[in-house]
Design a protein with these regions (language model features):
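Extended extracellular/luminal ectodomain segments enriched in beta-structured repeat modules
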Residues: 351-358, 406-407, 473-480, 528-534
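Short beta-strands within extracellular/lumenal beta-sheet-rich domains
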Residues: 341-352, 395-396, 460-471, 514-525, ...
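Short, surface-exposed beta-strand/strand-loop-strand elements in extracellular ectodomains
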Residues: 369-381, 490-501, 548-553
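Edge beta-strands of jelly-roll/beta-sandwich modules across compartments, strongly enriched
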Residues: 417-432, 489-494, 543-549
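N-terminal signal peptide c-region/cleavage motif recognized by signal peptidases
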Residues: 13-14
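Sec-dependent signal peptide recognition
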Residues: 1-7
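Mature catalytic domains of secreted/periplasmic carbohydrate-active enzymes
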Residues: 19-403, 412-444
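Short beta-strand-plus-loop segments that form exposed binding edges in beta-rich domains
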Residues: 412-418, 482-488, 537-543
Length: 555
């Protein structure tokens, strides 16, 4: 890093810049949340009987005698993480099928009943030792769902008696994972968790980041594409934070709870290794596009790696991870100049004109997220020229623009709550004389018609209608349901509920008014799982007709 003649210019004139007084107390992170956000890039590892089945959900068809990953080497896994620049590994110790990769007496469906290392192997133990030896942080994914035991999303059993029995199993599994393998820095409950585990987390992992469930300290971004919408605010209301199923879409700059976002994403098309995935390895450009839209929007990117049936991460995948890490360093390892400061303007003079095309800005989030709008300007030909603008800065904002030669660079905060605290304001020349011809294309939302209503299928009195979402919601994400009238009055919608495996998923559907029109935001946390919508509706008049449409929310 070359810091050249950094000059902090604080312009306090209220006529020039607007610094609002916050009507609410700003949410602030715990030291552990702030440290977690500083990691920026972490690595997921998905490995389960699905790996032997060429499937993404364990169908329980693989004999345990067939699971023998003879070349499994957790040192290689850590090597891949280090080469990629990841600061933490999150290991899927038990996915939704229920197979356990550690020595546990809570189930017969696990590594103890495989031929690997004579049934004595313990992947969790090996990985913990490898990570702790190398200074790599470690997190664990423990699915509350358990297909082998017939347990649904979030740990839901079919009867009260079965629920009580499973609660004991899940609590014991969590206790083992958090007490036997050293410090766990992150705990994943995919699909939330209705099993009471708050006491266990408080006892064994009081400083860990918790993904989903009522004890959550971080939030799912709301897709599995590695894309954080912009702006993604770090705060949200305590009600949404405690729902257990919050997403980045719930962010609110004036919220009272700090809930930073995590973007889980795949390096191939799916989460588990499969022969069908062999041609789908993402390019470095695709991964960098993901990086810009996750880390560059203030989120943490959790990028998956998929060991094959030998237990090793394939060499092609390992190489791509290293190339990705190298490209991040090439672009952002050294700034041309940088500074820090407080107030409505931060400026630096590099001492001579320099060509730049990227700026990284970071707030001191320990004091809360204060910036609401900003402009970045360069002094070009003796005049200040706007290079880019935005709203949220938060932990990190990466801005890119056409290469331009500037004599000075300035950050102007045009709207804020309380005095802005800029931790870092840095300029880069990434492209040199060869800027890219086009940016990575954004993922487009596709709207589909789910259902038509009229007097032929909906009466004038309240009725219940069930709609199968399986073909419409194949990917995990937040889906938007809208009822669009084509004749007569609007359909009278009393309730919309999400059903999975016979269970109503509380808080997975949120009604919101958008431009005066009701929308229903549906949270699908597990891809490939059958879901239904249960509607309570009636016609306001016989001539009413229309359609229900659905699309996955991208922005």
């Amino acid at each position: 890093m070359n810091v050249l003649m950094a000059v902090i210019l604080l312009l306090a004139s209220p006529a020039a810049f607007c610094a609002e007084q916050s009507p609410v107390k700003l949410a602030k992170p715990t030291p552990e949340q702030a440290a977690w956000q500083d990691m920026e890039l972490t690595m997921f590892i998905h490995f389960a009987p699905s790996t032997w089945q060429d499937t993404q959900h364990d169908n329980l068809s693989t004999p345990l005698s067939s699971i023998n990953p003879e070349k499994l080497d957790t040192e290689q896994w850590v090597d891949v993480a280090v080469a990629m620049g990841a600061k933490q590994i999150v290991f899927v110790a038990k996915h939704v099928g229920g197979f356990c990769w550690w020595q546990t007496e809570t189930t017969d469906y696990g590594v103890k009943n495989t031929p690997w290392r004579g049934g004595k192997g313990d992947v969790m133990k090996d990985l913990a030792e490898s990570c702790h030896k190398r200074g790599m942080k470690l997190g664990v994914y423990l699915s509350p769902a358990d297909g082998k035991l017939g347990i649904g999303v979030g740990g839901r059993a079919k009867t009260p008696e079965a629920q009580e029995n499973y609660n004991r199993v899940h609590r014991q599994q969590l206790t083992e994972l958090l007490s036997l393998y050293g410090t766990m820095d992150e705990v994943w409950f995919d699909g939330s968790n209705i099993v009471p585990v708050g006491d266990i987390l408080a006892k064994y992992a009081p400083k860990a980041m918790i993904f989903q469930g009522p004890q959550a300290t971080i939030t799912w971004i709301g897709n599995e594409d590695g894309v954080a919408r912009y702006p993604t605010w770090n705060a949200m209301s305590s009600e949404k934070a405690r729902s257990g199923v919050s997403t980045g879409h719930d962010g609110d700059p004036d919220g009272d709870v700090w809930m930073p976002s995590e973007c889980d994403a795949r390096i191939r098309a799916d989460w588990f290794w499969s022969t069908k995935n062999l041609p789908t390895l993402k390019s470095v450009d695709q991964l960098m596009g993901m990086y810009y839209r996750s880390v560059g929007h203030g989120a943490v990117l959790l990028l998956n790696q998929t060991p094959d049936t030998t237990g090793r991460i394939p060499e092609e995948d390992a190489k791509r991870a290293a190339e990705f890490g190298s490209e991040i360093q090439r672009r952002f390892g050294n700034s041309i100049a940088e500074t820090m400061g407080k107030g409505n303007a931060v400026e630096f003079d590099p001492g001579k004109p320099v060509k730049i095309d990227h700026v990284i800005t970071q707030e001191n989030i320990l004091e809360g997220e204060r910036v609401r709008e900003y402009v970045i300007e360069g002094l070009v030909g003796g005049e200040w020229k706007q290079l880019c603008e935005g709203t949220a800065i938060g932990h990190k904002k990466i801005d890119q623009f056409a290469p331009v030669e500037v004599a000075k660079l300035r950050l102007r905060i045009t709207r804020s709550v309380a005095e802005p605290q800029i931790r870092r304001f840095a300029a880069y020349s990434v492209w040199g004389d060869n800027p890219p011809k086009a940016e990575t294309p954004e993922i487009a939302a596709v709207t589909r018609t789910l259902w038509h209503w009229s007097s032929e299928n909906v009466p004038l009195e309240m009725t219940t209608t069930n709609l199968d979402l399986t073909a419409f919601c194949k990917d995990a994400g937040v889906y938007v349901l809208e009822f669009i009238r084509t004749a007569g009055k609007d359909l009278d919608v009393q309730s919309v509920d999400l059903i999975s495996q016979g269970h109503k998923l509380d808080k997975f559907v949120v009604r919101r008014m958008v431009r005066g029109t009701p929308q229903y935001h549906i949270k699908i946390s597990e891809e490939g799982t059958a879901h239904q919508l249960q509607l309570s509706v009636k016609l306001p008049e016989a001539t009413s007709r229309g359609q229900a449409t659905i699309h996955r929310m991208i922005k």
